[in-house]
Amino acid sequence: MAGIEGFAAIRGKLAQSEAAPGIVLIACAALALLIANSPLAAAWHALFHHPLPWTPVAKLDTLHLWINDGLMAVFFFVVGLEIKREVLAGELSDARRRRLPVLAAVAGMAVPALIYLAITAGQPALHRGWAIPSATDIAFAIGVLALVGRGLPPSLRLFLLTVAIVDDLGAVVVIALFYTSGLKLAWLGASALILAALVLVNRMGVRALLPYLAGAVALWYTVLHSGIHATVAGVLAAMTVPLALNRRHDSPLLRLEHALVAPNGFVIVPLFGLANAGVALGADFGESPALPLGIAMGLLLGKQFGILGSILVAERLGFAHRPEGASLRHLWGIALLCGIGFTMSLFIAGLAFPETPMLVEEAKLGILGGSLVSALAGLLVLRGSGRPVV
């Protein structure tokens, strides 16, 4: 019992710190958008994309690359820690409780992708972007949920977090399987050896953090050169960090996650937003609106239909039950908030169209538009959820 209480206490502290980073991220996204449409736009672009005078890693020769391939690996490391914690000691550890959020997350990824592919059906060059509207931004969504105020069932926030974590796991799998090219076997072999060494360290019962952190950096370096996106290394390394509590109720994973929550939420993700969210609203993106429209509709409509539809079907079939105290309107609002793609969607957009900056800019427009409308709609629906609903 003491072990379970220890997990719950640290889990509670982590949960309490999730709203503020979302609000900071919203502010950074707004600032990036403002600068991109101001006389400072050219200087801002040069700041992130001009070659650095010196870099310790030749492949990362701009600030933008260091943020997207370097700092974002730390972001994915934290995502990996969250996933492992939830699977072993959280909501996803109970088969009955994980049914609904897992089903909702899978449907919430599949339906947006199908809507995107339907809208871009006549343009095969755009099909690589199918995963862009499938993502959910945990920090952004929790930040908006915090603006609703009190009066919502506690189970709703937990449901949103669990769906978003499963969604993150799906995004990691998608990145590893569909956005990998030019594999280099020697670097892959080196990555496999480092990962095996980390697993061995775990099996030996080592609880000091230094071996895991050193191994994570080495794994990131080899994966960066292997052809697989470097951020995947963050998730793989996180999976080797031990979760189990010792007699003093100390868990290396929880200790590490707790230490990284603030840097991740207040430094890494906001920097990513500043470097990637800016888009010139008056720019000429070409004749076809299919790319931004497909992304926006995938986020706004796909998430609603996928998540809310899967919940209703699961209830009707007796497969799962809605969160305690949640009404249909509550769940509709949560489905809308899951349409806030932002961080992960922007990240996938860069992977989908690495050689075509114009398509990335178009994708940004769809991501920002779809995420903004989803956020506002979700806020309105949840703020009015005090009225009698089914």
From Swiss-Prot:
Bilayer topology term: Multi-pass membrane protein
Transmembrane ranges, per UniProt, are 23-43, 63-83, 100-120, 129-149, 158-178, 181-201, 208-228, 265-285, 293-313, 331-351, 362-382
Q: Does the keyword Membrane apply?
A: yes
Single GO molecular function: sodium:proton antiporter activity
User: Which domain of life does the UniProt lineage start with?
Assistant: Bacteria
- Any one cellular-component term (Gene Ontology): plasma membrane
Q: One Pfam family for this entry, by name?
A: Na_H_antiport_1
Compartments where located: Cell inner membrane
| GO-annotated biological processes | regulation of pH
Q: Which reaction does it catalyse?
A: Na(+)(in) + 2 H(+)(out) = Na(+)(out) + 2 H(+)(in)
Which InterPro entries is this protein grouped with?
A: Na/H_antiporter_dom_sf, NhaA
Q: Which UniProt keywords apply?
A: Antiport, Cell inner membrane, Cell membrane, Ion transport, Membrane, Sodium, Sodium transport, Transmembrane, Transmembrane helix, Transport
Q: Which family does it belong to?
A: Belongs to the NhaA Na(+)/H(+) (TC 2.A.33) antiporter family.
Name the job this protein performs.
Na(+)/H(+) antiporter that extrudes sodium in exchange for external protons.
Q: Which protein are we looking at?
A: Na(+)/H(+) antiporter NhaA 2
Source species, please? Novosphingobium aromaticivorans (strain ATCC 700278 / DSM 12444 / CCUG 56034 / CIP 105152 / NBRC 16084 / F199)
Q: Which gene encodes it?
A: nhaA2
